[in-house]
A protein has these predicted regions:
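Nucleotidyltransferase catalytic core that binds NTPs
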Residues: 2-236
Length: 236
């Protein structure tokens, strides 16, 4: 079954002005998922970088995902009062980051929903649009797993989706015993991904841009060009 056409678009790039949030044409918005396991990678994506793409690719390769949806958060609840770039720029950067890879699609469901962007609400919405034979896999790094107790309804998250947890420098993957102690039999739905970890963060990229330093090869080239063209992250 296809995901709702108003909420998921293929990663083709259209024209978008600064501060303008638009949806793609109908043909681009319809993602023909077609069964199997569907990865979900949420984030602020301010900006998206190769660490995000590598984590998604690591999960897809290990678990045989048919598609990975990148889901920018409109109002990330964990950011608090921390400033976040406008939604239009973050959506466009994410679209550009994934445009060249057919594995990826862009989900705008959190951009279209009012209120804080809680992952559990997004999974409920996505789950309702899928067949029973289709499985959602929530992709995260080990630091997110360590903090997931502070997320809204973490146990419900594990009911709605399997978890794929990748490595992050300074955050070792948990052992199976600890996961079973916390989640019981549901721990079998948590997949630990072995592979290289990249010591990279969006905040570090923003700092480098503000300092006038290169971000070449830390973000996709099209994302770098958009950051330069729009003067994003430069100190006033």
């Amino acid at each position: 079954m296809s995901l709702p056409s108003t909420r998921v678009e293929h990663a083709g790039v259209g024209t978008i002005g600064a501060g303008e949030l638009v949806t793609a044409p109908e043909a681009e918005r319809t993602a023909l998922i077609g069964g199997g396991r569907i990865g979900i990678l949420g984030g602020t994506f301010d900006p998206p970088h190769i660490g995000h793409l590598w984590l998604a690719t690591l999960a897809a390769d290990a678990l045989g995902l048919s598609r990975v949806l990148l889901m920018p958060a409109a109002r990330p609840p964990h950011k608090g009062a921390q400033p976040v770039s406008n939604a239009a720029d973050r959506v466009m950067m994410t679209r550009l980051a994934i445009a060249a890879d057919p594995l990826f699609d862009l989900s705008l469901i959190e951009m279209e929903r009012e209120g804080p962007s809680y992952t559990v609400d997004s999974l409920v919405e996505l789950r309702a649009s899928l067949d029973d034979s289709e499985t959602l896999v929530l992709i995260m790094a080990a630091d997110s797993l360590a903090e997931i107790g502070s997320w809204r309804e973490p146990d419900r998250l594990l009911e709605l989706a399997e978890w794929a947890v990748g490595p992050r420098p300074g955050w070792p993957l948990p052992d199976r015993g600890a996961l079973h102690e916390r989640y019981g039999e549901a721990a079998a739905r948590i997949h630990l991904l072995e592979g290289p970890s990249l010591d990279l963060s969006s905040s570090e990229i923003r700092r480098r841009v503000a300092a006038g330093r290169s971000i070449r090869y830390l973000v996709p080239r099209a994302v770098e060009e958009l950051i330069v063209d729009r003067g994003l992250y430069h100190q006033p």
